[in-house]
Design a protein with these regions (language model features):
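Residue-level recognition of strand-loop junctions within catalytic nucleotide-signaling folds
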Residues: 1-2, 32, 79-81, 122-124
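Short, conserved charged micro-motifs
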Residues: 84-89, 127-131
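PLP-dependent enzyme catalytic core of the Aspartate aminotransferase-like
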Residues: 95-96, 108-169
Length: 169
């Protein structure tokens, strides 16, 4: 249940605020005995290929969007076309077997970031990245088609909405 999940998440975060001495010693030993600089270069090449696969797929499948080309890290920020809302679109994306983080997750409140998604190219192989972007493009195209047919969606106020407390779910 959500209430238990949230408590487990907090416990996990509290448990790993500081790595254990054993963990720190293991990392120290690794750094002393292995060519970690070479490994970093290999990782940089791998992530560069994945980043390039994502940027290429965005250019091919999502030309109505904007995006950054990161010089580091493994996330691409994608700006959605006018009228689309990343948070509202997420359930349809998940149904189409692709996920992202809505830009709203990176702001303290309000609707800031609603028109952006953060895509990760850390784990999937380039062929999977391409397929994920293609699937996301289907969701974007579908939502744009709905906006073109019916106009932009405006949520109604939710005054008087009541819901059970998290620990009652």
């Amino acid at each position: 249940p959500p209430a238990v999940r949230e408590k487990m998440k907090l416990a996990s975060e509290a448990a790993i605020l500081c790595p254990s001495s054993v963990g720190q010693y293991s990392v120290s030993t690794y750094l002393d005995n292995f060519d970690w600089r070479l490994q970093i270069e290999e990782f940089r090449g791998m992530y560069r290929g994945r980043r390039d696969a994502m940027v290429s797929a965005l250019g091919e499948f999502m030309p109505t969007c904007t995006w950054n080309v990161p010089a580091g890290g493994f996330y691409v920020w994608v700006g959605l076309p006018d009228g689309l809302d990343a948070k509202d679109m997420l359930p349809r994306a998940v149904t189409n077997l692709v996920a992202y983080v809505s830009g709203t997750a990176f702001y303290a409140g309000g609707s800031a970031g609603h028109d952006h998604v953060r895509l990760s190219f850390c784990y999937p192989e380039p062929v999977e990245i391409r397929e994920g972007v293609r699937r996301l493009s289907e969701v974007v195209a579908h939502d744009l088609e709905l906006i073109n047919l019916f106009g932009p969606f405006r949520a109604r106020p939710t005054e008087g909405v009541s819901a059970p407390a998290p620990d009652q779910i």
